[in-house]
């Protein structure tokens, strides 16, 4: 992801806590500058970046409000935060405790909006990410959810079967539908698989 962003951005700085990941990025992706550190206290100056991109990470963090406050600190006025996270309503229906053992807290759209606004962001758009027709077919092949099939293997520390590996490798961007949460929308954001928020630092 960071390397794709580097193809259109003047400078990309990635941050990761894991030393092996930092070394991997340094050796494999020369266009990406990578820092070892805590996402809740990034070693960059105040108001030093134009965009913070954070996809599928916040659900793994223990102090989500602090992380979002840190994103606000890093952004210049008018800068944007792009954030995605699994939708708690579809990932862990009927419970506040995540099914995925690697998640600390999952959010629904209202909770994500509240976290962003409480930190001082203005939410520009809240979107739901839905499976398109090809992914719906893959879900059916894997017992109703290709995501649940992956989680089950991870929890069991079991290898992925060849058909699951092949299907995951075959997923393309165009297999997803991103639908804004606006009045009259064809989709209910509470039915989405993931949430995609774009928020602005005033």
Task: Cite the ranges covered by each PLM segment.
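Conserved SAM-binding loop
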Residues: 1-94, 108-113, 197-199
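Hydrophobic anchor at the start of a short beta-strand
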Residues: 12, 123-124
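Charged, low-complexity surface patches
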Residues: 14, 105, 188
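Phosphate/oxyanion-binding loops and surfaces in catalytic or ligand/nucleic-acid-binding neighborhoods
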Residues: 88, 118-123, 132-133
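A short secondary-structure junction signal
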Residues: 95-96, 137
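Short glycine-enriched, charge-decorated loop/helix-capping segments at active-site entrances
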Residues: 97-102
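Short alpha-helix
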Residues: 104-120, 126
């Amino acid at each position: 992801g960071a390397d794709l962003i580097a193809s259109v951005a003047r400078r990309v700085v990635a941050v990761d806590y894991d030393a092996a990941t930092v070394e991997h990025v340094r050796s494999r992706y020369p266009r990406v500058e990578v820092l070892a550190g805590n996402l809740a206290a990034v070693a960059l100056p105040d108001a030093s970046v134009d965009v913070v991109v954070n996809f599928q990470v916040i659900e793994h963090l223990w102090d989500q409000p602090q992380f979002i406050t840190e994103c606000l600190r890093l952004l210049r006025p008018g800068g944007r935060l792009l954030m995605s996270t699994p939708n708690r309503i579809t990932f862990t229906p009927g419970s506040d405790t995540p099914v995925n053992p690697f998640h600390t807290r999952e959010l629904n759209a209202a909770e994500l909006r509240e976290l962003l606004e409480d930190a001082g962001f203005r939410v520009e758009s809240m979107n739901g990410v839905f499976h398109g027709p090809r992914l719906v077919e893959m879900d059916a092949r894997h017992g109703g959810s290709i995501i649940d099939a992956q989680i089950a293997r991870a929890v069991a520390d079991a290898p992925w079967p060849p058909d699951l590996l092949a299907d995951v490798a075959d997923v393309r961007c165009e297999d997803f539908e991103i639908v804004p949460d606006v009045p009259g929308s064809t989709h209910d954001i509470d039915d989405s698989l993931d949430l995609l928020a774009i928020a602005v630092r005033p």
